[in-house]
């Protein structure tokens, strides 16, 4: 029985895809580095900002790139992010059913809170684990285990919901069932290769998982 659901943020419950892609393109251009296509950027999304910028630039020290990224990201945050269908109504219903909820993300806390507040989702979250709250981010199990410890819940009665490969890997390493979202830019076929316990095509599919533990496919 699922008693707690942990959500990734970007690309899972808040549509930050265009903001993230635009921020990377800006950072590379501003620092006179070769440009990348969306298709080159998307596979890396979900890992830490440093890891992504290092992969894109070949640089170990990405501090200047991170500054460019965050500057663009903050400036264009509200205009470039959006919501996914039925997220709010699903959160409200899960809360009504007594399901506890939290966030596990590789974002920093300020932008995490900003996005949650913008879409009125913060009120549902009992714990928020960001990249600065852990020593080892996803795909390591530490972020998921930190959230579980904060909530004092059983890993086997917890569900992780995410849009990226590292979400699946982190949850599995923590001994937590995981649902991958079919609206991920990575593509459902790619996510299936990493064997999530569930694939959901609509946020309301979580009702059935909570009720029966029946796989959605």
What is each residue range found by the language model?
Residues 36-40, 123-127, 155-159:
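Short acidic capping loops at alpha-helix termini that bridge into adjacent secondary structure
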Residues 2-89, 93-97:
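N-terminal helical cap/lid subdomain that shapes the substrate entry/recognition surface
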Residues 159-198:
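Acidic, Mg2+-coordinating phosphoryl-transfer loop and its flanking beta/alpha structural elements
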Residues 4, 138-168:
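Conserved Lys-Pro-Asp/Glu-containing loop-to-beta segment of HAD-superfamily phosphomonoesterases
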Residues 29-31, 51-59, 80, 88, ...:
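Substrate-recognition/cap helix-loop segment adjacent to the acidic, metal-dependent catalytic center
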């Amino acid at each position: 029985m699922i008693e707690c659901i942990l959500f990734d943020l970007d690309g899972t419950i808040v549509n930050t895809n265009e903001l993230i892609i635009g921020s990377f393109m800006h950072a590379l251009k501003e620092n006179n580095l070769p440009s990348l296509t969306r298709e080159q950027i998307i596979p890396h999304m979900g890992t830490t900002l440093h890891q992504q910028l290092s992969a894109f630039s070949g640089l170990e020290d990405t501090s200047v790139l991170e500054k460019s990224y965050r500057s663009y990201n903050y400036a264009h945050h509200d205009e470039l992010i959006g919501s996914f269908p039925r997220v709010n109504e699903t959160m409200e219903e899960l809360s009504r059913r007594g399901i506890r909820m939290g966030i596990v993300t590789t974002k920093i806390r300020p932008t995490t809170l900003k996005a949650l507040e913008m879409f009125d989702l913060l009120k549902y979250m009992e714990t928020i684990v960001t990249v600065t709250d852990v020593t080892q981010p996803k795909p390591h199990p530490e972020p998921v285990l930190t959230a579980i410890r904060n909530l004092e819940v059983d890993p086997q009665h917890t569900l992780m919901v995410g849009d990226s490969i590292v979400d699946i890997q982190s949850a599995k390493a923590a001994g937590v069932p995981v649902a991958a979202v079919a609206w991920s830019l990575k593509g459902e076929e790619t996510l299936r290769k990493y064997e999530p316990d569930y694939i959901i095509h609509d946020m309301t599919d979580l009702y059935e998982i909570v009720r029966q533990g029946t796989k959605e496919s």
